[in-house]
Amino acid sequence: MPLYRNQHIDWYRHLAFACVGGFFGAYAILCRGGVMGNAQTMNLLEMIIDALYGRGFNVLAHLGAFAVYVTGTMLTVLLPSLWGVNMRRLSPVITAAAAVTECFLPADMTVIVALYPIFFAMSIQWSSFQGARSFYSSTIFSTNNTKQASLALAEYLCTKDGRQLRRMGFFLSTLLCFHIGAAIGVGASHFWGVRGALWSLPLIAWAFFMVTQEEKAEAMQAVVAE
């Protein structure tokens, strides 16, 4: 049966992008000084610390990373609204471009600046794909997915509601795929160093394919609804 006929195609697309997010999380940590380029928490904390210690250049680098992340997030609204851009298709293309760019940035480059492509790509991925199966779930970090899986288990223990088991399964599967991607990122970084970013390209290609299958499914549903 073609994938686009599978009623869980949005879930499969979600898991594919979770693998991509996990890959870049591990890659950034191993190749770029232990900093995760998927989120802003550490970046902003380091910016405050550097400001208090008077490290002007570092503060500017962190501000740049913040601006890149905010810009990527805003573009997921601006591009579709102003020009009708399909962000679900554009996002993996941008991520692939970021992966290639990372290969040309020296390993000893200023860490935060070297992460700009990942900050940009992951901010776009996060806002372009916000979950599946009616669940809100990030594909670029694990905190909320861990929280939701834990809450679902607690709810099930209290109510014996089978829906909570399905909810827990969704978030646990997201965590699993995220860390499968991270494991691939570890291997890529170990064997290829900064050029290991290229290992993400098959994952990104598969995620893009899942987007096309989901779009076919949505088109079929629209025809049936008519």
Where are these regions (language model features)?
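Alpha-helical transmembrane segments of multi-pass membrane proteins
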Residues: 1-226
